[in-house]
């Protein structure tokens, strides 16, 4: 048994939204907290992944799916006698690509926490906009060592990668050339 065709089609509209909402939340509210910024971003990536898995699972259970894909569009911009439409379309190929894009986005978000040295001290000679150069720490014996330092623009990275994830997911579910490039 699978979910209704209409439910899954409506769900496709919501798959790209969590990352763009995460972008807005990080930029406007959580950018001072590194933990909150990556938590918001990873949670958004997880929600998109969950939606994509529901769509993918339902897509592979539909007989003759290529003949009746999940599709929906709305009138967006009037152009005289016609309308430019925006919409979503999930056929067998886009269901597969959606599966891989959502999975890859989630893995990149998770990997990025460690890659940016989360949990390490802030560098004592790092500058915003430049890569981290390390922090000087003193051990129990009084010896000074340079260790990896956390990325100075950590929250900004998660905001921008969330915006990128929104773009990738929108590209996969778009039903026409206009929304493919928007």
Predicted regions and their residues:
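Transmembrane helix-loop-helix hairpins at membrane boundaries of multipass inner-membrane proteins
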Residues: 2-11, 29-159
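Functional transmembrane alpha-helices
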Residues: 19, 91, 161, 171-172, ...
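Alpha-helical transmembrane segments of multipass membrane proteins
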Residues: 24-28, 166-173
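Transmembrane-helix bundle of Major Facilitator Superfamily
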Residues: 153-157, 167, 175
């Amino acid at each position: 048994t699978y979910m209704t065709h209409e439910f899954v089609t409506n769900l496709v509209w919501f798959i790209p939204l969590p990352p763009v909402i995460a972008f807005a939340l990080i930029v406007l509210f959580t950018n001072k907290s590194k933990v909150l910024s990556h938590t918001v971003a990873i949670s958004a990536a997880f929600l998109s992944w969950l939606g994509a898995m529901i769509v993918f699972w339902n897509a592979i259970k539909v007989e003759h799916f290529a003949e009746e894909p999940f599709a929906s569009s709305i009138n967006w911009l009037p152009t005289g006698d016609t309308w430019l439409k925006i919409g979503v379309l999930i056929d067998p190929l886009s269901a597969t690509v959606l599966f891989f894009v959502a999975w890859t986005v989630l893995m990149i978000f998770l990997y990025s926490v460690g890659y940016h040295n989360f949990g390490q001290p802030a560098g004592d000679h790092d500058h915003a906009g430049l890569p981290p150069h390390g922090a000087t720490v003193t051990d129990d014996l009084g010896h000074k060592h340079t260790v990896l330092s956390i990325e100075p623009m950590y929250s900004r990275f998660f905001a921008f990668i969330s915006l990128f994830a929104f773009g990738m997911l929108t590209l996969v579910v778009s039903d026409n050339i206009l929304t493919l490039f928007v």
